[in-house]
Each structure stands twice: as structure tokens, then as C-alpha cells.
């Protein structure tokens, strides 16, 4: 996951935004406590969504605690769900996914990026090992995705559906694990599968120019020969992304969301469409690094 699953702040109630921030801050705190203070740098909106959704469908007690930001002690924070199982799972999935993303950067990145990736690799490897010991099922799902993706990318002309399949299957598997019965498994599998496709496609579109310049794999590159093709591709991608987003949202609507529904609705109905418009039709490259 790559930081695209965001809220649309202007459309949230103030209390909902404060709650979202408290989940985001709690995930940051959990990463630091469970792995390392430096693990906080892999904090992302995607896993904030995962934590909110997991806590939203489970009946675990959720506490709100006041504290101070580790990076800015002058800043007061509220932490939601720190220490509960769902938050720990979100943190573990964060470090496991970050580790395999780092391996991908080493394989495909530029020289400068490869050197930086090699330097931090031992830290990521240690965090991943610890997370994998606690949640081997997450390690298995993400590892399988990474291997499958590597095989798929050997064929530069592979179909876009085939290229998105590893990410889609991984997220379907991970989301399934949050279910408590067979019906929920089907719902969360569909939700995760189509959200995984959306994430893969939006990332591929966002990286299109960079991949073209660096000679990296991108399933959309074969469709571009001139500027007109580029504009037509954006329209096509918009349709593909809309389909994946709608199918994931349809599955989400079948889930029994017990809390944070306003936030989760905002992500699906406002946040994802905003990110999609920004990546496809906005100016410049999408920025996923802005902190709350």
C-alpha cells in the first residue's frame, strides 16, 4: 500500500477529523513502541484506514488517551486504540509491507535510491522479522504477493489485470483475516481485492512518467505512443479505477461497521475520488507525504 487511501479533510466533521488524527497518532506510537522510533517514518494513511476499518468491525474496547507527540513534545495528541490488537496488526502489516517495498526499490530503483535502500535494509529486515513472528499469516500473504509481482513484471507486455492481481490477492487475503465468520470473509475478501486493484492502478498511473524515464515496468506504458494516447489512457484509467472503487465500496456497504463509519464513508466517497482526480488530472505528482 502506498499512501493513497486518504480522507478528504474538508468534508469531515470536526469531531470525526479529530478521531481520525487520534488513530493516525496511535498507529505512529504503536510503530515506535513495537519496533523502533525510526519505524514511525513508515507511517501511512493506508494503514490508518486498515486500523480504523479493523476497529470499526470488531467489538474490542477502544480507549482515547491524551499524550504528547514523540517528534514534537510541545504538541499535545490524543491516541485512539493504542495497544489493542487491531492497532498492533496495522503496525505489523505496515513494517512487513514496507520491507517488501524496500526490496522492490533495491531491484528497480535508481542508483541513489538503491544505495539508500541498502543502508536501511538491516533495520527494515529486523522489524519485518519481529512482525512476521507475531503475525506469520501477514508475512505469508505479503511475501507471496512480492514473489508473484516479480514474476508478472518479467513480461513487459502483460495485461493490466494480471499486473494488479498480486496486490489484489494480497489485500483480499489480509482483509479476510479480519472476518469473524464465512459471510464476513466473503465481504472482506471482495472489499480487499478491489481496493487492492485500485491501489495498484493509481500507483501505476502516478508513477507512469517516472517509470518511462527510468525504464521500469509499468503495465500502462505499452499504451502510450504520443500525447493523444496519454490523454486517452487517463480516461481509460479513470473508468478502470471507478469500477474497482465502486466494487470495493459495494462490499464495504455490506459490512457491519460498528464505529468510525463517518470516517470510513468519507474515505470511500470523498477521499479516494479526490486522490484519483488529483493523480489523473491534477497538476504535478501526487504528494502522499503530508503529515497530519
Question: What is each model feature region?
Answer:
Residues 265-270:
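A glycine-rich phosphate-binding loop feature that marks nucleotide/adenosyl-phosphate handling sites
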Amino acid at each position: 500500500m502506498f499512501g493513497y487511501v486518504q480522507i478528504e479533510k474538508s468534508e469531515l466533521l470536526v469531531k470525526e477529523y479529530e478521531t481520525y488524527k487520534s488513530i493516525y497518532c496511535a498507529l505512529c506510537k504503536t510503530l515506535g513502541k513495537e519496533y523502533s522510533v525510526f519505524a514511525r517514518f513508515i507511517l501511512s494513511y493506508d494503514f490508518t484506514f486498515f486500523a480504523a476499518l479493523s476497529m470499526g468491525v470488531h467489538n474490542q474496547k477502544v480507549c482515547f488517551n491524551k499524550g504528547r507527540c514523540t517528534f514534537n513534545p510541545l504538541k499535545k495528541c490524543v491516541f485512539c486504540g493504542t495497544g489493542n490488537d487491531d492497532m498492533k496488526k496495522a503496525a505489523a502489516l505496515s513494517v512487513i509491507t514496507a520491507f517488501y517495498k524496500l526490496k522492490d526499490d533495491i531491484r528497480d530503483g535508481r542508483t541513489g535510491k538503491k544505495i539508500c535502500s541498502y543502508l536501511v535494509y538491516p533495520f527494515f529486515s529486523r522489524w519485518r522479522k519481529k512482525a512476521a513472528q507475531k503475525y506469520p499469516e501477514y508475512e505469508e500473504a505479503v511475501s507471496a504477493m512480492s514473489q508473484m509481482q516479480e514474476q508478472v513484471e518479467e513480461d513487459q507486455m502483460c495485461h493490466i489485470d494480471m499486473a494488479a492481481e498480486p496486490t489484489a490477492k494480497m489485500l483480499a487475503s489480509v482483509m479476510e483475516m479480519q472476518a469473524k465468520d464465512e459471510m464476513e470473509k466473503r465481504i472482506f475478501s471482495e472489499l480487499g481485492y478491489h481496493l487492492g486493484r485500485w491501489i495498484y492502478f493509481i500507483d501505476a498511473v502516478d508513477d507512469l512518467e517516472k517509470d518511462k524515464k527510468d525504464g521500469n515496468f509499468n503495465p500502462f506504458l505499452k499504451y502510450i505512443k504520443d500525447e493523444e494516447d496519454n490523454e486517452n489512457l487517463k480516461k481509460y484509467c479513470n473508468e478502470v479505477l471507478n469500477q474497482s472503487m465502486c466494487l470495493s465500496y459495494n462490499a464495504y456497504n455490506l459490512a457491519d461497521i460498528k464505529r468510525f463509519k463517518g470516517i470510513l464513508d468519507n474515505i470511500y466517497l470523498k477521499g479516494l475520488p479526490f486522490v484519483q482526480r488529483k493523480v489523473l488530472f491534477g497538476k504535478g505528482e501526487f504528494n502522499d507525504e503530508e503529515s497530519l
